[in-house]
């Protein structure tokens, strides 16, 4: 499809224009990004190294960590560059690439969360058939499906956005190339693009959320039938971390994308975007390890092995 754009680059306004906030924000977001990389890479490595964590739940969790690294890395380095040297320009192709990878990994996380909900349903509601239900092939198909849908969704969104002509302002009132902020700059008819954004985002979010809610409804029914008092707290606690992650992710995504353009506020969008592109990827490994004895035990084993290796060297 022909692209009639006359814009070769965009200008990202960033989070703030106040000079006194540039350095504090740079330090804060650098720490957040380092914690995100360390936590998520650590989670992936831990799952790979410990055979006790080679289960469907941790397989999906490792992919969730990968998705968190993906969309955090698509956004944060450019934000840090803008804060440090005030380089707010982003090329046309870099803007498209940033939007593409954000859409890919956000969609992947969306469907991974529903896959994890189905996994918890199989573990709690059909424990005797769990190993035959969540086979390696099933897990691989679910994970591959998440990535395929992610790339398909991103391709549609990018193709729809960058077919438009940008012949007016090139100043994006955001800190990254997010579709709602970019399409406001077009001099083409944008109602179709806005409709595509809302419809596809709504389908992705609510379909995955429906699978998640149905899974947890059956989990709740099963727990209430089989356990009373303290008995049902243990199986329910295995789902607690997942429910927290679901709540944090979907609240911000719904605020960002499943609203008509007339109700968008750039300041609200920036706050929500900081939360889901930087804060949630940082919190994810913390949320999943706080009450998880398996991960804690695996971590202690790695620490003990590292200490033993150091002692043997010195």
Curated annotation (Swiss-Prot):
Disulfide bonds: 95-187
TM spans (from-to): 24-44, 53-73, 98-118, 138-158, 195-215, 236-256, 270-290
Keyword vocabulary terms for this entry: Cell membrane, Disulfide bond, G-protein coupled receptor, Glycoprotein, Membrane, Olfaction, Receptor, Sensory transduction, Transducer, Transmembrane, Transmembrane helix
GO cellular component, one term: plasma membrane
Cytoplasmic compartment residues: 45-52, 119-137, 216-235, 291-314
Glycosylation sites: 3
Classification via Gene3D superfamilies: Rhodopsin 7-helix transmembrane proteins
Topology in membrane: Multi-pass membrane protein
Record PROSITE patterns: G_PROTEIN_RECEP_F1_1, G_PROTEIN_RECEP_F1_2
Extracellular topological intervals: 1-23, 74-97, 159-194, 257-269
GO biological process terms on file: G protein-coupled receptor signaling pathway; sensory perception of smell
InterPro entries the UniProt entry points to: GPCR_Rhodpsn, GPCR_Rhodpsn_7TM, Olfact_rcpt
Function comment: Odorant receptor.
Name of the protein in question: Olfactory receptor 5B17
């Amino acid at each position: 499809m022909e692209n009639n754009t006359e814009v070769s680059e965009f200008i990202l306004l960033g989070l703030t224009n106040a000079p006194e906030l540039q350095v504090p924000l740079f330090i804060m977001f650098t720490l957040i990004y380092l914690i995100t990389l360390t936590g998520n890479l650590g989670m992936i490595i831990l799952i790979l190294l410990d055979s006790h964590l080679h289960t469907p739940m941790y397989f999906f969790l490792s992919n969730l960590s990968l998705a968190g690294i993906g969309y955090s890395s698509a956004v944060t380095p450019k934000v840090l560059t803008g804060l440090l040297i005030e380089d707010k320009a982003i090329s046309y192709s870099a803007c498209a690439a940033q939007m593409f990878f954000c859409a890919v990994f956000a969609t992947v996380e969306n469907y991974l969360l529903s896959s994890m909900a189905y996994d918890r349903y199989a573990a709690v509601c059909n424990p005797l058939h769990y190993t035959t239900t969540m086979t390696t092939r099933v897990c691989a198909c679910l994970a591959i499906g998440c990535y395929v849908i992610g790339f398909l969704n991103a391709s549609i969104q990018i193709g729809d956005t960058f077919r438009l002509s940008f012949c007016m302002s090139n100043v994006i009132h955001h800190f990254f190339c997010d579709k709602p902020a970019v399409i406001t700059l077009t001099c083409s008819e944008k109602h179709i693009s806005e409709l595509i954004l809302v419809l596809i985002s709504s389908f992705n979010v609510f379909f995955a959320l429906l699978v998640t809610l149905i899974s947890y409804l059956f989990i709740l029914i099963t727990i209430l039938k089989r356990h009373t008092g303290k008995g049902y707290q243990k199986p329910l606690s295995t789902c607690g971390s997942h429910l927290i992650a679901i709540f944090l992710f979907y609240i911000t995504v719904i605020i960002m994308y499943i609203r008509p353009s007339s109700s968008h506020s750039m300041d609200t969008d920036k706050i929500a975007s900081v939360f889901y592109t930087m804060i949630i990827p940082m919190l994810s490994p913390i949320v999943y390890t706080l009450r998880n004895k398996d991960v804690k035990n695996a971590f202690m084993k790695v620490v003990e092995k590292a200490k033993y290796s150091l002692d043997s060297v010195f």
